């Protein structure tokens, strides 16, 4: 299982985007990531750090819009993302 809160949030983000099939040009608003998290885990600073780490690892692609940041999974890293989810989820 993931150890830190940031790792748990990363897993939540990847799993949510994976379940919604948000690869490449299918986008997901960053404001909707908090849905599905327990109230004590909805700290926007931790979520921002997790998103920044995933973008830095190139697992997430970001698109700035006038109403917020849109995210999608990078299809080039599909195998790595699937392995990470399987390893940490089960």
Would you name each region that the model predicts?
Residues 1-25:
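Short alpha-helical segments that sit at the start of domains
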Residues 2, 38-40:
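A generic structural signal for short
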Residues 23-37:
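Short acidic, hydrophobic short linear motifs in intrinsically disordered regions
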Residues 40-56:
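Short amphipathic alpha-helical interaction segments
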Residues 55-65:
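A short, conserved structural fragment
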Residues 67-74:
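Minor-groove-contacting beta-hairpin "wing" of winged helix-turn-helix DNA-binding domains
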Residues 76-90:
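Short, amphipathic alpha-helical interaction segments positioned at domain boundaries
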